[in-house]
Amino acid sequence: IGALQGAVDRVLTQPTQSIVRNVAVVNSLYK
């Protein structure tokens, strides 16, 4: 269960980081 939770966290964290990065780029473009 712990390993599965770690895998789920990893899968969810990577797209979240890319989304945050994209949002930061868009915000910098529109400022």
Swiss-Prot record:
The UniProt record lists the keyword Protein transport: yes
Localisation: Cytoplasm, Cytosol; Golgi apparatus membrane
Quaternary organization: Component of the conserved oligomeric Golgi complex which is composed of eight different subunits and is required for normal Golgi morphology and localization.
Keyword terms: Cytoplasm, Golgi apparatus, Membrane, Protein transport, Transport
Domain of life: Eukaryota
Membrane topology label: Peripheral membrane protein
UniProt protein name: Conserved oligomeric Golgi complex subunit 5
Task of the protein: Required for normal Golgi function.
Family: Belongs to the COG5 family.
Transport is among the record's keywords: yes
Main location class: cytoplasm
GO annotation (BP), single: protein transport
